Amino acid sequence: MKTPFGKSPGQRSRADAGHAGVSASMMKKRTSHKKHRNNVGPSKPISQPRRNIVGCRIQHGWKEGSGPVTQWKGTVLDQVPVNPSLYLIKYDGFDCVYGLELHKDERVSALEVLPDRVASSRISDAHLADTMIGKAVEHMFETEDGSKDEWRGMVLARAPIMNTWFYITYEKDPVLYMYQLLDDYKEGDLRIMPDSNDSPPAEREPGEVVDSLVGKQVEYAKEDGSKRTGMVIHQVEAKPSVYFIKFDDDFHIYVYDLVKTS
């Protein structure tokens, strides 16, 4: 398959594309510092709730530093429950999923909800779609010179809203991407790897509560000694040890197996 602009996943422009991971031991539970007190004096006007934009097509300007304003158009896939200000977005022409606080980020300007809605499509092979979720795969990309570039990764889930697309991540570049993988499979560009001989996870008793890291803070020490902080925003249902992480200094969504890396 060809990617937009002839780029394979790892050719995105961003810092720290391949750091090793985040240790589960670095997790810190988020604490609340709110104080409860009685309000005295004039009350503040109640702000009107914002429109739910999940599933909507949007466009907005983007300005970083002293650079020019660029225009972006895409689809809002999800609003993150543990941080309702944060939205997951699939921008037109880009394969990775972005996480932005659309109403708070000062780099975002002139946010507009477009009238066109995302068309619903029927999955061509529901059984195959269910079969590939949680599986290791080899994904072939066509480079600019026509050669094939193989990327090994894992299919994480069906993407929300855009229901013929799938969330996937790669060993070489552990961030969240989405592709129409059924088409790639039928074209011979996606191969599902045989299941490993790893022992299956222990079955849980009915009603048993399993600790989740969702909502917890993470801290990652970079090679230069500096630290980056973020939050665990999602647990992958098909692989419960795998989580999505949104770092404060990056708009990409990172994908880590926090049991394996601990």
UniProtKB/Swiss-Prot annotation:
Expressed in several tissues including testis. Residues 1-50 are annotated as: Disordered. It comes from Gallus gallus. The keyword Nucleus applies. It comes from the Eukaryota. GO terms for cellular component: nucleus. May play a role in mitosis. One of its GO terms (biological process) is gamete generation. Residues 27-38 have a biased composition (Basic residues). Pfam families: Spin-Ssty. Its main location: nucleus. InterPro entries: SPIN/Ssty (IPR003671), SPIN/Ssty_sf (IPR042567). This is Spindlin-Z.
